[in-house]
Each structure stands twice: as structure tokens, then as C-alpha cells.
């Protein structure tokens, strides 16, 4: 996940105070000259280095619990860019306002920090080990959940460092440090017997000194009376620059001989499973539509946010090779239990809750039961599409498990029991932060990018057809109007108009009955509008023909009050009149990802704290 300040030309990354001062000297030392750099003490924090009266001033910027950023005693801001913008207009306690950015020289990129260099590999290892994922499922999980996973692993990054020795006594540490050259500043770090404490062992003057590292009540690490740090690796990096209470600064690593093995199989943090309810009986149905994980002990405050990979519908039920042996389009009726619980109904018939019995497990399913009297042509069309849908496999679409021909034609789908997106959001403006909305829309974009890659046009993308598994996991559903394109086709022409959702349709769909992935992009823009308006109806009080005239006049729906300008800009691009000028879903997903990551990097606290961060940004 990129650093929230990475795009700023005056951000230098992980450089020392001395290096910052050297850059400011070379830039002329004018009053108000400034740059921004990573803070070595505070995870996600920065330091503002400023010149005034030919002197250097350095102000730590802490990331607050609610995801905002503030200089001690100063106002909170939703990002480092916004903070610098504020202080360029009002010094508010600084010796002067920020007048001139000390931009990086051409070709100089921000210096990556220690964790920056390890982040991608650690995220990949964590996701692979925790959820046993491989292939596309692994890649999808990394993309969608990188912000959350990074927060989990940042505090364990020290276990990847060559100076960390995970099982070493005091005597063994001394033997290691005395072996070979006894250079001043040679060091290693090891855990102590007392839980949560560590020892820093350091050579100086041919003698080994041991320093206690403990955690305070806030979880910060420090040597007694020393500077406090969020992580052990930050403490070590800082002590490489200055002794700060040590007899000598850290200089030469005493490497762990098994460091390479640790890199290959790191000790990553245990995943905090989000489910605490009793384990599900296989003969009962869950109202929330997925199978909970086994119970675990949890305190009232220990409620980490759920991740899609924690649910039973992230991977295909056929991801197990044993189950894959039985994968067929047509399902046996005796393996399908249809409950009396009706989830919905429509022109086609009804949707019922059920359970499908597989070789090794039972899964909750939603069953579309076609009403009696459905025309043969419609059944044939549905079967053709079912054959294609049966091959689709992505965590962010509702998978077709199979078709059952018995008392009626039944389509057996994955269960996503959280209801449609627009109903979930309606009236919850105060409860659901913008970052949560962006997270769900990013998942929809990932699902649509997959369909685009498979030459599959949805034709009915709308908030009503985005179903939730939980508040952090969405799936695209209702492929009733979907159509697969041939490999050489970019669009196809519908035979008849039928009952079309005109308010979600692109102009070429209405005018010429031409559908493509770019017309789905238009619908995605309308879905975005629904989501950021918290479930409001698009083109309120307008009828279909009025909407078409409205669009022909070059008009578009206004930006919803809660919608960030970056997201309305993407919406507007989705609503470009000429289909060939609209972005594809590859582009849409990348833009959604970048924006969601930028929000996720700010919002560290629980939902109520996150809303404070949103308010600070507003």
C-alpha cells in the first residue's frame, strides 16, 4: 500500500535528521523552506523539517488513533498533504508558516523504510499461511485486503530482520557477540523470558552490555527512560542513528545464522478470527448466509474487523480437489434441501434458502426456483447462460453451484445473506464511513474486471444486485440479463427491449440495444452514485424517457453530499457519452483501489473513530 505522502514532491521517505538538514542547506536555507520525511519512532507518522532564522526545526507528526495526523498540540488533519496545506496558510505554533517546499531533485525517489522493503513479501506470506490460498484467490485477497493485513503484520516485521534472534539466552548472546571481531556497535536483539520484553545486546570496548526493552501500557517499546517506538524495528533503526541512552550507537549486525530460514517461513501474527459464535450444526441454516468459523475466546473489546477470506464463500466450494471430482452443472435433487424461507421473488419466480450437500461438507445456498409456465425459449436461454456462469469463479461474484431439474428448474447459487447494497446503506450515513463504502465498491470493481476479462457482460449491474456477505464483503449477483461475448466481439445486440432497468443503462443500450463491458462501466457509475448517496434512488422522480433526454443534454446526476470529489470524478468518467471513451474495468479497478488504499491508510480506529477522521477531512 503506497505511503499517503508518496505523491508529494517534498516527501523524502525514510531519511535521517542529518540528511534532511543537508537537503535544506542545499536548497538555500530560506525562511519557511520545508520538507517531509518518515518518522522513525511512530508507525505511519512523519517529521516536518522547517527552516527559520537560518536554524532547523523538526516537528513530529503523529498518526492519531482515529486515522488523522497532528503535530503535538496542533489541529488534526485527514492526511499529510492537508496538514502541510494548513500550515502553509497559518503557522499555528510553528516559528513561521510553510512557504517553500524543498522538492526532491529530479530522479530522486522517496527513500523506502525498513518495513517498506519487506511489506509485499510479508503480506503475501501472511495471506498464504493464514487462509491457505494460492493462485488467483491469493492475488485477489492481497489486492483487496492489503491495508488490513499490513496493519496486522507491521508489529512483527522485526522477526524478518537479521539482527533478531528468536531463541537465544543471555550467555549464548554473549558467545555470539564475542566470536569473531568485537567491533564497537556490534549488536543483536532477543526475547527475554518475561512476556513482552526483549534484550538489546551490544558490544563496546570488548565488553557486552545488555539493555532491557519493555512495553508501556500503550504498547510502545522503549529502553528505560528512552524514546518510545511503535515497533521494535523502528527502535533499532533509530538507535543506529544515535545512541540515545546506549553506551554506543548500533552499528554492526550480529546476524542470526537461521535468518534465511526465518525469511522463508516467518512467524506471522495469528489471525484474529472475527467469529465468536458457537460452531454451526450442519443440519441448520444460518440467517446471515455463511458458515461461521469455530468459536474462540474473545473479550468485548477484541473485535477485529472481518475479512472476506474468513467466510466460507471466499473460495469456490470446489476449491477442495476432493469436491472438484463431483463438480457438474446438473445437481442431484436428493443432495438439495429447499427450505420454506423465501428470500425474494420476481418475474422469473422466487428465491429460497437451502442447503446443498457435497462430498465432505454442506453449504448454505440461495435457490432460484423458476415459476411454472416459463416459456421453453426462456428456459433454453437460461440454460445456455448457466453453462457459462458455471465456469466463472471469483471471490467477488455470486457463484453458480449448479442447476437442478426436478419439480421446477432451480438455479443453485452461493448464499450472500447480508442483503442488497442499497438497503444496507439506506439510513446508515452516520454508521457506515465513506471508507467502508469505497471498500465495497472496490470489490465490485474487482468482480467486474474479472467478468470483463472473461468477455462477460452483466447488463444489470446496480446496487440492488450487489449482495453483502457482511459489511466488509460484497458480491455481484443476478446474472439474469448477462450475456457472454465471443472472443472477437466487443459488444452484442439484444433481440428485444423487454423490461430494462433504463436508469442504469448507457445511451447506446437504450438507443441501439448494444451492450458491452463499457456499458457495464456506465452502470457501475450509477451503482457508485447509489452507494455514495447511501441507498438513494438515481434520477429521482424522473421516468425512463426523461432520463434519456437528461443525458442527451449533457447533464449528469450531481455529486452526492457524502461523495469524495475523487470518486465523483470517476463516476463522471463512467458516464462519458461515447462508449469507446469510457475507462475499462482494468482502469476503474485501479482507480478505486488507489482511493480505497488512501482512505484505509488514514482510518486506523474503530468505525466511530473513523467517522471522526472523515469529519476532519470534510
From Swiss-Prot:
The protein's name in its UniProt record: Tyrosine-protein kinase ZAP-70
Residues annotated to bind ATP: 343-351, 368
Catalytic reaction annotation: L-tyrosyl-[protein] + ATP = O-phospho-L-tyrosyl-[protein] + ADP + H(+)
Tissue: Isoform 1 and isoform 2 are expressed in thymus, spleen and lymph nodes.
Family (UniProt): Belongs to the protein kinase superfamily. Tyr protein kinase family. SYK/ZAP-70 subfamily.
Record PTM text: Phosphorylated on tyrosine residues upon T-cell antigen receptor (TCR) stimulation. Phosphorylation of Tyr-314 and Tyr-314 are essential for ZAP70 positive function on T-lymphocyte activation whereas Tyr-290 has a negative regulatory role. Within the C-terminal kinase domain, Tyr-491 and Tyr-492 are phosphorylated after TCR induction, Tyr-491 playing a negative regulatory role and Tyr-492 a positive. Tyr-492 is dephosphorylated by PTN22.
Glycyl lysine isopeptide (Lys-Gly) (interchain with G-Cter in ubiquitin) cross-link, renumbered residues: 543
Family annotation (Pfam families): PK_Tyr_Ser-Thr, SH2
Amino acid at each position: 500500500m503506497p505511503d499517503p505522502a508518496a505523491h508529494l514532491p517534498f516527501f523524502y521517505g525514510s531519511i535521517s535528521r542529518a540528511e534532511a538538514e543537508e537537503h535544506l542547506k542545499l536548497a538555500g536555507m530560506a525562511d519557511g523552506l520545508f520538507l517531509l520525511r518518515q518518522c522513525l519512532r511512530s508507525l505511519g507518522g512523519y517529521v516536518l523539517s522547517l527552516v527559520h532564522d537560518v536554524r532547523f526545526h523538526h516537528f513530529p507528526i503523529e498518526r492519531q488513533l482515529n486515522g488523522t495526523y497532528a503535530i503535538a498540540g496542533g489541529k488534526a488533519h485527514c492526511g499529510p498533504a492537508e496538514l502541510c496545506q494548513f500550515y502553509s496558510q497559518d503557522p499555528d505554533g510553528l516559528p513561521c508558516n510553510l512557504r517553500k517546499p524543498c522538492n526532491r531533485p529530479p530522479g530522486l525517489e522517496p527513500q523506502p523504510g525498513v518495513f517498506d522493503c519487506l511489506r509485499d513479501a510479508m503480506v503475501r506470506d501472511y495471506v498464504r499461511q493464514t487462509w491457505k490460498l494460492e493462485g488467483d484467490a491469493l492475488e485477489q485477497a492481497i489486492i483487496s485486503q492489503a491495508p488490513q493485513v499490513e496493519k496486522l503484520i507491521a508489529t512483527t516485521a522485526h522477526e524478518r530482520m537479521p539482527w533478531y534472534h528468536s531463541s537465544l539466552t543471555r550467555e549464548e548472546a554473549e558467545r555470539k557477540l564475542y566470536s569473531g571481531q568485537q567491533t564497537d556497535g556490534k549488536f543483536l536483539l532477543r526475547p527475554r523470558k518475561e512476556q513482552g520484553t526483549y534484550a538489546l545486546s551490544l558490544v563496546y570496548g570488548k565488553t557486552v552490555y545488555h539493555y532491557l526493552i519493555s512495553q508501556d501500557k500503550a504498547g510502545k517499546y522503549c529502553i528505560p527512560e528512552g524514546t518510545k517506538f511503535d515497533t521494535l524495528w523502528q527502535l533499532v533503526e533509530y538507535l543506529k542513528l544515535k545512541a540515545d541512552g546506549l553506551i554506543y550507537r548500533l552499528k554492526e549486525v550480529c546476524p542470526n545464522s537461521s535468518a534465511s530460514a526465518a525469511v522463508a517461513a516467518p512467524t506471522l501474527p495469528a489471525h484474529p478470527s472475527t467469529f465468536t459464535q458457537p460452531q454451526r450444526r450442519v443440519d441448520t441454516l444460518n440467517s446471515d448466509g455463511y458458515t461461521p468459523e469455530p468459536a474462540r475466546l474473545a473479550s468485548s473489546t477484541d473485535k477485529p474487523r472481518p475479512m472476506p477470506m474468513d467466510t466460507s464463500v471466499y473460495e469456490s466450494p470446489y476449491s477442495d480437489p476432493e469436491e472438484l471430482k463431483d463438480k457438474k452443472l446438473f445437481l442431484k435433487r436428493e443432495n438439495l434441501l429447499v427450505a420454506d424461507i423465501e428470500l425474494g421473488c420476481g418475474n422469473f419466480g422466487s428465491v429460497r434458502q437451502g442447503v446443498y450437500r457435497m462430498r465432505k461438507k454442506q453449504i448454505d445456498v440461495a435457490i432460484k426456483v423458476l415459476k411454472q409456465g416459463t416459456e421453453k425459449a426462456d428456459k433454453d436461454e437460461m440454460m445456455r447462460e448457466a453453462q457459462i456462469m458455471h465456469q466463472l469463479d471469483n471471490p467477488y461474484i455470486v457463484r453458480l453451484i449448479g442447476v437442478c431439474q426436478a419439480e421446477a428448474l432451480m438455479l443453485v447459487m452461493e448464499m450472500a445473506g447480508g442483503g442488497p447494497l442499497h438497503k444496507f446503506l439506506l439510513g446508515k450515513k452516520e454508521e457506515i464511513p465513506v471508507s467502508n463504502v469505497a471498500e465495497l465498491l472496490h470489490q465490485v470493481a474487482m468482480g467486474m474486471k474479472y467478468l470483463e476479462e472473461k468477455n462477460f457482460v452483466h447488463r444489470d449491474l446496480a446496487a440492488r444486485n450487489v449482495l453483502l456477505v457482511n459489511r466488509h464483503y460484497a458480491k455481484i449477483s443476478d446474472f439474469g440479463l448477462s450475456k457472454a461475448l465471443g472472443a472477437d466481439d466487443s459488444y452484442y445486440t439484444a433481440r428485444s427491449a423487454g423490461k430494462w432497468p433504463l436508469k442504469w443503462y448507457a445511451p447506446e443500450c437504450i438507443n441501439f440495444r448494444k451492450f458491452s463491458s463499457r456499458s457495464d462501466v456506465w452502470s457501475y457509475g450509477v451503482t457508485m452514485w447509489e452507494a455514495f448517496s447511501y441507498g438513494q434512488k438515481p434520477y429521482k422522480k424522473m421516468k425512463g424517457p426523461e432520463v434519456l433526454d437528461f443525458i442527451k443534454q449533457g447533464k449528469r446526476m450531481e455529486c452526492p453530499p457524502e461523495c469524495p470529489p475523487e470518486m465523483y470524478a470517476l463516476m463522471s468518467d463512467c458516464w462519458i457519452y461515447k462508449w469507446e471513451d469510457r475507462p475499462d474495468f482494468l482502469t476503474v479497478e485501479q482507480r478505486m483501489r488507489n482511493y480505497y488504499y488512501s482512505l484505509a491508510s488514514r482510518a486506523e480506529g474503530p468505525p466511530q473513530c473513523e467517522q471522526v477522521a472523515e469529519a476532519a477531512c470534510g
